[in-house]
Amino acid sequence: MSILEKITSSPSECAEHITNKDSCLSKKIQKELTSFLQKKETLGCDSESCVITHPAVKAYAQQKGLDLSKELETRFKAPGPRNNTGLLTNFNIDETLQRWAIKYTKFFNCPFSMMDFESIHYKFNQVDMAKVYKGEELQYVEGKAVKRPCNTFGCVLNTDFSTGPGKHWVAIFVDMRGDCWSIEYFNSAGNSPPGPVIRWMERVKQQLLKIHHTVKTLAVTNIRHQRSQTECGPYSLFYIRARLDNVSYTHFISTRITDENMYKFRTHLFRIA
């Protein structure tokens, strides 16, 4: 079985909570834009996201008072480098995690952080994980601030400082399901967690030990999965997604996942246009 078959995502450009994959659009918007959708080839489009971002369609929607931006934000996957190896931005990452938080209602999506989070006020360093579990910590889902009990937590960090352009994306996943909880660090290049992350993991462990009897920290770094210069972002998101879909962390310490898998995974992450 391919590693991509172990997760529940697909190459459809629809956001994953949309069950009807024949169309990502709401019925109202489908009806209003029928003529455009039926002749999308004449617009130079091969997808619904292309149609609703076309200038002519946007102008028509504005005249009709249709909110196409809401359709894009809530019913489609995030924009991003789907069919090329462009480097992922923090927007690509955070917008993807926000959409996953709609599908996984017990997932806490934390905004990205740079590695100087101990001195810069990133959300990542302010979260109390016990409050995440109890539903006392604010998160943003579908553009709204909500509080809800979460038994999983995910964040993507960059190994550069805030003053730099960015170096390498890594993943944090906290699993508060089952009997033994875990605080996990994944680096596709196989490098060990730096000091700030080690301190963060230990602090979170102490938070969780106040409400649960068994908590461990894990550095999932014994295999160098990534050989390219471009796929650290997809690897980091893939780790979080695989763990949400109950793929064990042990898979990542026993089996190398190739860059070719990440090229394919990009089509699972982002919409077509």
From Swiss-Prot:
Sequence positions that bind substrate: 226
The entry's keywords: Host cytoplasm, Host-virus interaction, Hydrolase, Inhibition of host innate immune response by virus, Late protein, Protease, Thiol protease, Viral immunoevasion, Virion
GO molecular function, one term: cysteine-type endopeptidase activity
Gene induction: Expressed in the late phase of the viral replicative cycle.
Major localisation: host cell
Superkingdom: Viruses
Pfam families named in the record: Peptidase_C48
Active site: 168, 187, 232 (nucleophile)
GO BP: any one term: viral protein processing
Annotated Gene3D superfamilies: Adenoviral Proteinase, Chain A (3.40.395.10)
Gene Ontology, cellular component aspect: host cell cytoplasm; virion component
Enzyme Commission identifier(s): 3.4.22.-
Record's subcellular location: Host cytoplasm; Virion
Purpose: Cysteine protease that plays several role during infection including processing of the structural polyprotein or inhibition of the host immune response. Catalyzes the maturation of the pp220 and pp62 polyprotein precursors into core-shell proteins. Plays a role in the disruption of host pyroptosis via specific cleavage of gasdermin D/GSDMD. In addition, strongly decreases the host cGAS-STING signaling by targeting IKBKE via its enzymatic activity. Also impairs host FOXJ1-mediated antiviral effect via degradation of FOXJ1.
Family of the protein in this entry: Belongs to the peptidase C63 family.
Protein name per the record: Cysteine protease S273R
